[in-house]
A protein has these predicted regions:
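Active-site core of metal-dependent hydrolases
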Residues: 168-270, 283, 288-290, 308-311, ...
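Divalent metal-coordination and catalytic microenvironments
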Residues: 13, 28, 33, 55, ...
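His/Asp/Glu-enriched, well-ordered alpha-helical/loop segment
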Residues: 191, 265-339
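N-terminal metal-binding scaffold of metallo-dependent hydrolase/deaminase domains
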Residues: 1-44, 349-350
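Divalent-metal coordination cores built from histidine and acidic residues
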Residues: 78-194, 237-245, 251
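Anion (oxyanion) recognition and catalysis
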Residues: 85, 109, 190, 232, ...
Length: 352
């Protein structure tokens, strides 16, 4: 739509994002692929090409706080990047697999995406985790795997501290560490300078992870009010992956499974709404990677579900932002109607 060196202004109803933007700002001035200024409607410079989008908002690119680079998705890493960028995602926290594919993707896609990789999760042998990590039988083996992750360039360590939801029996499957083991693992990782993100379902597993120093809880199904209060007090991130749970309905094996899933999702959404009201930082993560959770579109569905759970539109967008909208930074912007992406601006250029 525009020449790269021409000064251009993108104007909408408002600019939503962390950084220099204030509530009365509704336009972003771009030159040479960089944000020159964030403006109000009455302060447009002369000789500027203007693109108007009434009824829309301008937002930063998104960060997906939980996904996997999975071979089962049927896409190359470049294809995954294409899908993510088309949905306005240029930053992602990669949640691990058995072979550490995210570490390779981080290197190969460094010029396109900012990927923070866990490499592979750490899980207790005999419990859930073989598809997303490597099993350990004791603390010493866990420390050895953690050292391997650090050497390979992992940005954080993912610890699997529960199983997954089984809708047929309405229970959380076996998985996780003993409390003492989990405490030692988290302390070891933190001493090495990395955060710990815990896969945890069931309020006891979530509470242990938060008590012992986890930086983030992934999933958190069946979390109690008391544990939500603890999450708020300790300023732990909560990544509820609502869309991932909801997507399981298409795979329900029976009417009983479907009913249990619907009730579980309803309860999880209620917990997310309470978490936000308590001041918990609820972050959007798609859990994309499996074929039934597509890259990009499932993240956008997650945003809608977070708002449906009771988080205001602007708070959802701010939490989803990969970075602030600031002067002199690269002009990566989204033109949104609700959460629907109408245009993507990458390095000051409208993508076709």
């Amino acid at each position: 739509m525009n020449g790269h060196d021409q000064r251009m202004l993108i104007r909408a109803d408002r600019v939503i994002g962390r950084g220099d933007a204030s509530p009365h700002m509704n336009a972003v001035l771009i030159k040479g692929g960089l944000i020159e200024d964030i403006l109000s409607e009455d302060s447009v410079p002369a000789h500027t090409k203007i693109y108007d989008f009434p009824g829309h908002v301008i937002a930063p690119f998104f960060c997906d706080y939980h996904l996997h680079f999975s071979s089962s998705a049927g896409l190359s890493t470049a294809g995954i990047a294409d899908r993510l960028l088309a949905h306005g995602i240029n930053k992602a926290f990669e949640g691990g697999d058995a072979i550490g594919a995210g570490l390779t993707a981080k290197k190969n896609l460094a010029d396109r995406l900012e990927i923070l990789s866990s490499g592979f999760g750490i899980y207790r042998e005999g419990g859930y985790g073989k598809y997303i990590g490597r099993g350990v039988k004791d603390i010493e083996q866990a420390k050895s795997e953690i050292e391997a992750l650090i050497s390979a360039g992992a940005d954080y360590v993912k610890v699997v501290h529960s199983g997954i939801y089984d809708p047929e029996d309405d229970r959380i499957t076996a998985g996780g560490f003993e409390r003492r083991e989990l405490g030692e693992i988290i302390a070891y990782v933190r001493d090495r300078g990395l955060p710990v993100f815990c896969h945890a379902n069931g309020t006891e597993a979530v509470q242990e992870a938060v008590d012992l120093g986890a930086s983030a809880i992934i999933h958190g199904l069946q979390v109690s009010e008391e544990t939500l209060s603890l999450i708020a007090d300790k300023r732990v991130m909560f990544i509820p992956t609502l869309q991932a749970f909801q997507s399981l309905r298409s795979r329900a094996a029976s009417d009983v499974s479907l009913r249990n899933l619907e009730e579980a999702v309803e309860g999880h959404m209620a917990a997310v709404g309470r978490a936000h009201a308590m001041g918990v930082k609820v972050m959007p993560g798609s859990d994309a990677g499996p074929p039934f959770i597509p890259y990009g579109s499932s993240f956008c569905d997650e945003l809608w579900l977070l708002m449906k759970a009771g988080i205001p539109f602007e708070d959802v967008l701010r939490n989803a932002s990969a970075r602030a909208i600031k002067r002199d930074q690269q002009a990566d912007l989204l033109i949104l109607e609700g959460f629907e992406i109408r245009h993507v601006v990458r390095r000051g250029e409208f993508l076709q």
